[in-house]
A protein has these predicted regions:
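Conserved alpha-helical scaffold segments that buttress catalytic/binding sites
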Residues: 1-154
Length: 154
């Protein structure tokens, strides 16, 4: 790749799909399901979040990604994983998503791992909401980033 001379062998993927984990899935089409399965991506649906609790899910997620190493971790947080009750300003609003506390817990656990190297938070769109929803979504997005980068209550 031009500009990425440190990638000596372009045949080796930069990110292995088996090192990815999705949390909070609840609305997938057949193609998305097939894609996730075919690449061996670890995925936890909202059913599993409800069944095991977000604490156990995050324990399994971090064990899968980090194992017993301190490798760098990238968190990609899609705000539409959160229930629209808490974050309505997004293009894909599907009821039954992560609760306010579950979303924050994910970010807090990533911060506690000490391995966060980078983060993106996507799908925040303040133009797609009713009165007040834009502020709730933006405030939550800022809070999630703050939590993931180590801001804590104490």
């Amino acid at each position: 790749m031009k500009g990425f001379h440190w990638l000596n062998d372009e045949s080796i993927p930069v990110l292995l799909p088996t090192r990815l984990v999705y949390v909070g899935l609840r609305d997938l089409d057949k193609g998305e399901k097939a894609f996730i399965r075919s690449l061996g991506i670890k995925a936890y649906t909202m059913h599993e979040v409800d069944k095991f609790g977000i604490g156990k899910i995050m324990e399994m997620v971090l064990d899968h990604i980090l194992g017993r190493t301190d490798r760098p971790l990238h968190l990609s947080f899609d705000i539409d994983a959160v229930d629209p009750l808490y974050a309505p300003s997004t293009g894909t609003r599907v009821a039954g998503g992560l609760s306010y506390r579950e979303a924050y817990y994910i970010c807090e656990e990533v911060a506690h791992s000490g391995c966060l190297a980078s983060m993106d938070l996507v799908e925040v769109n303040p133009t797609l909401t009713t009165a007040g929803g834009d502020e709730r979504t933006v405030d939550m997005a800022v809070g999630l980033i703050s939590s993931a980068t180590g801001n804590s209550i104490l």
